Amino acid sequence: MIDQYKHKQLQIGLVSPQQIKAWAKKILPNGEVVGEVTRPSTFHYKTDKPEKDGLFCERIFGPIKSGICACGNSRASVAENEDERFCQKCGVEFVDSRIRRYQMGYIKLACPVTHVWYLKGLPSYIANLLDKPLKKLEGLVYGDFSFARPSAKKPTFLRLRGLFEDEISSCNHSISPFFSTPGFATFRNREIATGAGAIREQLADLDLRIIIENSLVEWKELEDEGYSGDEWEDRKRRIRKVFLIRRMQLAKHFIQTNVEPEWMVLCLLPVLPPELRPIVYRSGDKVVTSDINELYKRVIRRNNNLAYLLKRSELAPADLVMCQEKLVQEAVDTLLDSGSRGQPMRDGHNKVYKSLSDVIEGKEGRFRETLLGKRVDYSGRSVIVVGPSLSLHQCGLPLEIAIKLFQLFVIRDLITKRATSNVRIAKRKIWEKEPIVWEILQEVMRGHPVLLNRAPTLHRLGIQAFQPTLVEGRTICLHPLVCKGFNADFDGDQMAVHLPLSLEAQAEARLLMFSHMNLLSPAIGDPICVPTQDMLIGLYVLTIGNRRGICANRYNSCGNSPNKKINYNNNNYYKYTKDKEPHFSSSYDALGAYRQKRIGLNSPLWLRWKLDQRIVGSREVPIEVQYESFGTYHEIYAHYLVVGNRKKEIRSIYIRTTLGHISFYREIEEAVQGFSRAYSYTI
């Protein structure tokens, strides 16, 4: 059992066979050692009791009922005498039944078996350490070929006959049919190596420090060679350099964690506690069992058959032994990772068995479903909608969620301010929704941040802190600029809200997690708070006005619908006039005209603008020049209008725009001015 006060983290890694045996081994008072699972049976079909030395054995994993052994005798869990802790008849320990959640067993494999995660994973750790191709290692593990044992002290049979040129040479033809089982075992122990045992021997002979030194020397040699000009050779050199770096990192990791490379080949297979792979009896004599039990049964049966062939059947052909070793390897592979060698194992109803990898990985795996995705107090969940009036660091919480999250704080303040005398009356005031409750709730929320999280949390911007504000309705309001960090949109996405309770959590939320402090992507440094989706559509609609300038009036004059017939013979129709496109001296006048419904959002208009040297010094030729009786003139360009006097002096400039462009410009101008003021304060 993991003690939550002693253990602060969980690490998954390799362990030695001695450690696996220590997890499961028990010594009975009579000196008998239990812990090894040798039978594939589970429960007896008549008594419904666990079979001895089976997958649910009470001697190995503990009693099903607390303090009651397999015989039915009961005794206190705590006994002064060591002999009294075990039943003298059945050997079951008198302990709490919860031990079956963490007490493990083991299967002693008749032959070494490689761990499929370390052989077929990407990258393959075994192939990287041995510096061998993965396909050849797989062929060696599954008995497709053998190689000669390197032996320099004495001549071997294969060396005398000259069948192999190198110390380690492949033998692609079968040797085993020429030997009986004892003869083949003797031959294999002296001359050849095959199966996972050959991999284990090579891993055991490795010196990790020498691997690091040799790999570093080779990497430096490749680095000094430089580029040869041959694209294919340069590519092979780059791949080799990357491989050497990975190999050095892997060897360094093994040294730092005190892990031996040969532990990647299993001699003892751990058996999970029975409560983690239960058998459930339902009504109607229906039995529901975990798929892992069936996979364990398969491993035990094949392992027992191999042990029988190796120990008791002296006349069995060696091909049968090698085939059985391959079956044991495949059974363990299926238990650890179903489908690693192609088609996964299926039951009689064509349903795929779930292996240990399937139980652990994925969204419904053990980690994400039961360890990471647990329900917690002081949290809520609702659909998100856009909050256009919110600041970047604010979020809108519905009244129903806010009063639930901050209920204890509201009760505390109600009692502190003597609005109520006890907790019961305070809860009644909250339930009746009295006005004082909302006043205190707003005071409490003003200085307390909340955390918003959208699953899946793939990076640290998936959970950010916000200052909550009360909103009507039942949805959470969110500023649209923070959507990219959450990878969220407003089409029905849901987000969870959490309340940090401790002062440390609140300080971390304010200093590190507030949304206005996470403006850049932590991965690449690009801005993360950029307009996306709904905002882009809104900006497009806001600035969709006539972009082709005054010349577009010839094709679609202001106020005409696309289907309206235009008389192009009338030259005055598309001629510039002040009546069609009104003039405004300021943006406030234009906004006032829009509120009075005199102009539309995308109606073209002329807005008086400050003198701009880029416009004054422009060499653009006007489209039309109009002169008035007092000598003033109007030079009309595609997007602006220049008004001059008789002395050819520019009196004013009007730009051709729309109210949408004006509104967008005002928002950007206010944002830039606010940033400049904030920057000046920091200086």
Curated annotation (Swiss-Prot):
GO terms for biological process: DNA-templated transcription. It catalyses: RNA(n) + a ribonucleoside 5'-triphosphate = RNA(n+1) + diphosphate. Gene3D superfamilies: 1.10.40.90, 2.40.40.20, RNA polymerase II, clamp domain (4.10.860.120), RNA polymerase Rpb1, domain 3 (1.10.274.100). It is found in: Plastid, Chloroplast. Zn(2+) binds at C69, C71, C87, C90. Its main location: plastid. GO terms for molecular function: DNA binding; DNA-directed RNA polymerase activity; magnesium ion binding; zinc ion binding. Its cofactor is Mg(2+); Zn(2+). Keywords: Chloroplast, DNA-directed RNA polymerase, Magnesium, Metal-binding, Nucleotidyltransferase, Plastid, Transcription, Transferase, Zinc. Binds 1 Mg(2+) ion per subunit. Binds 1 Zn(2+) ion per subunit. It is an enzyme of class 2 (transferase). Its EC number is 2.7.7.6. The keyword Metal-binding applies. GO terms for cellular component: chloroplast; DNA-directed RNA polymerase complex; mitochondrion. Mg(2+) binds at D489, D491, D493. In plastids the minimal PEP RNA polymerase catalytic core is composed of four subunits: alpha, beta, beta', and beta''. When a (nuclear-encoded) sigma factor is associated with the core the holoenzyme is formed, which can initiate transcription. DNA-dependent RNA polymerase catalyzes the transcription of DNA into RNA using the four ribonucleoside triphosphates as substrates. This is DNA-directed RNA polymerase subunit beta'. It comes from Saccharum officinarum. The lineage of its organism: Eukaryota, Viridiplantae, Streptophyta, Embryophyta, Tracheophyta.
